From Swiss-Prot:
Part of the Ragulator complex composed of lamtor1, lamtor2, lamtor3, lamtor4 and lamtor5. The Ragulator complex interacts with slc38a9; the probable amino acid sensor. Component of the lysosomal folliculin complex (LFC). This is Ragulator complex protein LAMTOR4. The keyword Metal-binding does not apply. GO terms for biological process: cellular response to amino acid stimulus; positive regulation of TOR signaling; positive regulation of TORC1 signaling; protein localization to lysosome; regulation of cell size. It comes from Danio rerio. Keywords: Lysosome, Phosphoprotein. Transmembrane segments: none annotated.
């Protein structure tokens, strides 16, 4: 079921799955990340760690987007409001061939 919370996530090219997370837990999930509480916990810990690096005098988070890259896939993590959006995408980038 597509909701306003997830409708944009459904249309991302090469998307293998997604999570929508708040401090209270997983709000929505689909694909390879459906009901993946473990990955949600790991991602939230990474976000909390990155948020410790705030600049003095700013209320904004120190980042809005974070990518965790593996050989075959990428986790694209975006913070919007009080929610963390995680999309697992196929990694189509390959190292250039040097001839």
């Amino acid at each position: 079921m597509t909701t306003a919370l997830t409708q944009g996530l459904e249309r991302i090219p090469d998307q293998l799955g997604y999570l929508v997370i708040s401090e209270d837990g997983v709000l929505a999930s689909a694909g390879e990340l459906e009901n993946d509480e473990h990955t949600a916990g790991v991602i939230m810990q990474m976000v909390r760690t990155a948020c410790r690096f705030r600049l003095h005098g700013t209320a904004e988070p120190p980042f809005k987007r974070m990518s965790v890259m593996f050989e075959d896939y990428v986790y694209a993590v975006t913070i919007s409001g009080q929610k963390v959006f995680v999309v697992k995408r196929q990694n189509n980038q390959r190292e250039p061939v040097i001839v």
